[in-house]
From Swiss-Prot:
Protein name: Protein translocase subunit SecA
Enzyme class: translocase
Lineage: Bacteria, Bacillati, Actinomycetota, Actinomycetes, Mycobacteriales
Gene Ontology annotations for the cellular component aspect, listed alphabetically: cell envelope Sec protein transport complex; cytosol; plasma membrane
Tree of life domain: Bacteria
Entries under SMART domains matching the protein: SecA_DEAD (SM00957), SecA_PP_bind (SM00958)
Catalytically driven reaction(s): ATP + H2O + cellular proteinSide 1 = ADP + phosphate + cellular proteinSide 2
GO molecular function annotation: ATP binding; protein-exporting ATPase activity
Entry binding sites for ATP: Q87, G105, E106, G107, K108, T109, D494
Oligomeric form and interacting partners: Monomer and homodimer. Part of the essential Sec protein translocation apparatus which comprises SecA, SecYEG and auxiliary proteins SecDF. Other proteins may also be involved.
Length: 955
């Protein structure tokens, strides 16, 4: 973790920045009387006025006071919420590219309206990033009402949307979405085969809500797009049969803290007996080891109804951090298949990586980045170091009066939950609303059953019921309400005492068939009357709740991060309301088992305390803080390590994606190919003439290799002699120049041939398709090899070598080899692919269609010029090019130029689990895909993923 002194050092000058923000807020407030006098039409016309002034040279900083005043007034007129002074400060902090640290309940979503409106004036697009689809859609509708009133377009990116819908959403002035969706769209844009298929239009300005969750917690898990692997395997079910026969601490050991397993010799022997093999670790059987490890992990580390649920024959991951089911998302590296085998459901295909990027490197693409959170101070150093973001604490609108009670710790979980139920029943009887935070679906359902037995009316908010989330939250602050939530952190919803009037009013209007997006006029016309009616209903109840002590937040377990605990507590005591919080813990809690649990248990045993008598001591708080700090340190190290290794890939990815974009745009295609021909022929000649004199060179082998590359028009026998035993003096340079001239002449003839068959300019289109196809395939193969390299690079430490340095060095060599192979295969395809005119009904400008030439003509050459290999086979050529006249060129694994059957793997909201989402185009056919080793071998042999508006944020 960053040291406290470093954090303090980075926050030097904060006071001056806060004073500056106060002056800006004062200036904006002073403009209110002038703006209030404007009619709706005049207020709306301000947007075009600001755009004209921006085009004439005024900066956004100069427009800020007026633009903020206009957006503030529009918010008041449309949603009955006016930005407080501190929210204006927060908006200015965001515009200047900082993180605004605003406590829970201070109205971060409303604050975001100000910088989003201002920066949308520039016309480059504003991205508002949230933690889940629910919040993205809700905020785009809720705050979109304000932006639409001012003449701006708003849209939302949701999982499952088509490319056309995404393109339209990115064309809007302000686009809402999750970090995963924005990142996946960036990766997909760098997999497309046409400029028309691009969806994003640049990375100008982003506001990240819950910035600590997205940029810190989730940053240790990269975004990965993968597709079905080539090979297949049936071993998952076999090892799912064997796993129950293995006994913990006899056949294997488990480290819960590190979430790893280790197989003992006895376990290996049992597996060998079951499979009828002599040695599990010999080369032929080594792929089975990963199946064994995954089967044991599925048994010990992945629990049904906690980490996943089984619904309609499908294993669906549960984000334990938020309690949401993540439909379509899957674990990587065969883990999901192992769980499917364990649960005896259909086993879906394993995948190979097609594209990947870390969140750190994605968000660093933005020209200006900002964020909002209630808890960023402890991560100030990391945010500054990685993203160059300063953290500015924004004062609260009203003083906090919530009472945070000390933790109560019990010996057993059963005793803890009994005490929780007793506490809740007592508070329910006096009319105090209670919000209970649990860490899993299983625990929330257990508590629900206990409350039902005691006759306590309650609502459950977890992965199985989140469809009713808005209504449950809207009523969670009512007198006597009891709400069990799998986890509230990251939900971005306030629990308002007496009930949330905004959400209740919205639900009422939706029941009448009104909607802020599809029926905006009718919705806005009815809004004020319904809202006033609801406010009157909830006001009296809110007074009763305040008398009862406000919202009581009860946590049933501490989380890995103190920040998450604080977010749960922050649901109570918003905007100066009374409130209370307490955490109930037990020695059986996961955090206590992972760290320091045994020491506490021995103390409680020595004190001879009954199970139902808790202790409340500073020692407990210190132990918990120590455990949480250790987890935070571990996660920080993981994030740093991910970033170090991804920096190597990021440099390579930047080169490939820039090259790919140039090919898409058709920039100087002819010049690129001519240079490739020069490089490839030069490499062949240099390899063949590296040693000795002309009589020592194996020119026959060189010519054989060159003929598989292009139709050679000169005879080496004529160059070196007439065959009578004497050789002419010819230097390597002269030989090279002769062959280069011949190759370029051959390419000119090839271009004339192609243009004659398919029309003028067809050669450029063929070049574009071939280069894209080969580039994509070589990049995928390179990702395979880099992934494999990273898996084993840690062993270099045993040889006293720095694994990172070794990874950088070997990764650079592999990248260079990949680029050489790319040139060679591209030249071979361009010379040897058979081209014919496309059928008129399916013509694609400029009418190029490609079919394979003969196998001999399409054989591939080796990257090592001294020992040439055949060029790509006909099968490989067909994979690279497409097959029929109307088809675009496509690489292996792609269909008509478009990837299909994709899986999208990224971080959960806690950043802890690697998850994936199957693409809509994926076939439902179940197929086992092979191990990573099998896939690599196969690759070499072939050439080798509308909810209610946000609660009212009037502060």
């Amino acid at each position: 973790m960053p040291s406290l002194s470093l954090s303090k050092l980075l926050r030097v000058g904060e006071g001056r920045m806060v004073k500056r923000l106060k002056h800006i807020a004062d200036h904006v407030s002073s403009l209110s009387p002038e703006v209030e006098d404007l009619t709706d039409e005049q207020l709306r016309a301000k947007t075009e006025e600001f755009r004209a002034r921006y085009r004439d040279g005024e900066t956004l900083d100069e427009l800020l006071p007026e633009a903020f005043a206009v957006a503030r007034e529009a918010s008041w007129r449309v949603i009955d919420q006016r930005h407080f002074h501190v929210q204006i400060m927060g908006g200015a902090a965001l515009h200047f590219g900082n993180i605004a640290e605003m406590k829970t309940g201070e109205g971060k979503t409303l604050t975001c309206v100000l910088p989003a409106y201002l920066n949308a004036i520039a016309g480059d697009g504003v991205h508002v990033v949230t933690v889940n689809d629910y919040l993205a859609k809700r905020d785009s509708e809720w705050m979109g009402r304000v932006h639409r009133f001012l003449g701006l377009d708003t849209s939302v990116i949701l999982s499952g949307m088509s490319p056309a819908e995404r393109r339209a959403a990115y064309a809007a002035d302000i686009t809402y979405g999750t970090n995963n969706e924005f990142g996946f769209d960036y990766l997909r844009d760098n997999m497309t085969h046409s400029l028309d298929d691009l969806v994003q239009r640049g990375h100008s300005f982003a506001v990240v809500d819950e910035v600590d969750s997205i940029l810190i917690d989730e940053a240790r898990t990269p975004l990965i797009i993968s597709g079905p692997a080539d090979a297949s395997s049936k071993w998952y079910a076999e090892f799912a049969r064997i796993a129950p026969l293995l006994k913990r601490d006899v056949h294997y050991e488990v480290d819960i803290r590190k979430r790893t397993i280790g197989v003992h010799e006895a376990g290996v022997e049992l597996v060998e007996d079951q499979l009828g093999i002599d040695n599990l670790y010999e080369a032929a059987n080594s792929p089975l080891v990963s199946y064994l490890n995954n089967a044991i992990k599925a048994k010990e580390l992945y629990t049904k109804d906690k980490d996943y649920i089984v619904r309609e024959g499908e294993v669906i991951i549960v984000d334990e951090f938020t309690g949401r089911v993540l439909v379509g998302r899957r674990y990587n590296e065969g883990m999901h298949q192992a769980i499917e085998a364990k649960e005896k459901v259909e086993i879906k295909a394993e995948n190979q990586t097609l594209a990947t990027i870390t969140l750190q490197n994605y968000f660093r693409l933005y020209d200006k980045l900002s964020g909002m959170t209630g808890t960023a101070e402890t991560e100030a150093a990391e945010l500054h170091q990685i993203y160059n973001l300063g953290v500015i604490p924004i004062p609260t609108n009203r003083p906090m009066v919530r009472v945070d009670n000390g933790d109560l710790i019990y010996k057993t979980e059963e005793a803890k939950f009994d005490a929780v139920v007793d506490d809740v029943v007592e508070r329910h009887e006096k009319g105090q609303p209670v919000l209970i935070g649990t860490t899993s679906v299983e625990r929330s359902e257990y508590l629900s059953k206990q409350f039902t037995k005691r006759g306590v009316a309650h609502n459950v908010l977890n992965a199985k019921f989140h469809e009713q989330e808005a209504q449950i939250i809207a009523e969670a602050g009512r007198s006597g309400a009891v709400t069990v939530a799998t986890n509230m952190a990251g939900r971005g919803t306030d629990v308002v005492l007496g009930g949330n009037p905004d959400i209740i009013a919205d639900i009422a209007l939706r029941k009448q068939g009104l909607d802020p997006v599809h029926t905006p006029d009718d919705y806005e016309a009815a809004w004020d009357d319904v809202l006033d009616q609801v406010k009157a209903e909830v006001k009296a109840d809110a007074d009763k709740v305040r008398e009862a002590g406000g919202l009581y937040v009860l946590g049933t377990e501490r989380h890995e991060s103190r920040r998450i605990d604080n977010q749960l507590r922050g649901r109570s005591g918003r905007q100066g309301d009374p409130g209370e919080s307490r955490f109930y813990l037990s020695l059986g809690d996961e955090l206590m088992r992972r760290f320091n649990g045994a020491a506490l248990e021995s103390i409680m045993t020595r004190l001879n305390l009954p199970d139902d008598v808790p202790i409340e001591a500073k020692m407990v708080s210190k132990a918990i803080k120590s455990a949480q700090t250790q987890v935070e340190q571990q996660n920080f190290e993981i994030r740093k390590n991910v970033l170090k290794y991804d920096e190597v890939m990021n440099q390579q990815r930047t080169v490939i994606y820039n090259e790919r974009r140039q090919i898409l745009e058709g920039k100087d295609m002819e010049g690129q190919v001519e240079k490739m021909i020069t490089d490839v022929v030069t490499a062949y000649v240099d390899g063949a003439t590296a040693e000795g004199y002309v009589e020592d060179w194996d020119l026959e082998q060189l010519w054989t290799a060159l003929k598989t590359l292009y139709p050679v028009g000169v005879d080496y026998k004529e160059l070196v002699g007439d065959g009578d035993g004497e050789t002419n003096d010819i230097t390597a340079d002269e030989l090279r120049e002769t062959l280069l001239t011949d190759a370029h002449d051959a390419y000119a003839r090839r271009e004339a041939e192609i243009d004659g068959v398919a029309g003028a300019g067809s050669m450029r289109e063929l070049e574009r398709r071939v280069l894209l196809s080969v580039l994509d395939r070589k990049w995928r193969e390179h990702l395979y090899e880099m992934d494999y390299l990273k898996e084993g690079i840690g062993l270099r430490a045993m040889a006293q070598r720095d694994p990172l340095v070794e990874y950088q060095r070997e990764g650079f060599d592999m990248f260079g080899g990949m680029l050489e192979g790319l040139k060679e295969e591209s030249v071979g395809f361009l010379f040897n692919l058979q081209v014919e005119a496309a059928a008129p009904q399916a013509a694609q400008a400029p009418g190029v269609s490609v079919t394979a030439a003969s196998a001999a003509a399409t054989a591939a050459a080796s990257p090592a010029p001294a020992a040439p290999r055949p060029l790509p086979t006909q099968e490989a050529a067909q994979q690279a090019q497409g097959t029929a006249a109307p088809s675009a060129l496509r690489a292996k694994g792609l269909d008509d130029g478009e990837p299909r059957g994709l899986t999208y793997s990224g971080p959960a909201e806690d950043g802890n689990a690697q998850l994936s989402r199957r693409g809509a185009a994926e076939s439902d056919d179940a197929a086992d895909a092979g191990t990573r080793r099998q896939r690599r071998e196969a690759a070499r042999s072939q050439s080798k993923g509308k909810k209610a508006p946000r609660t009212k944020r009037k502060r």
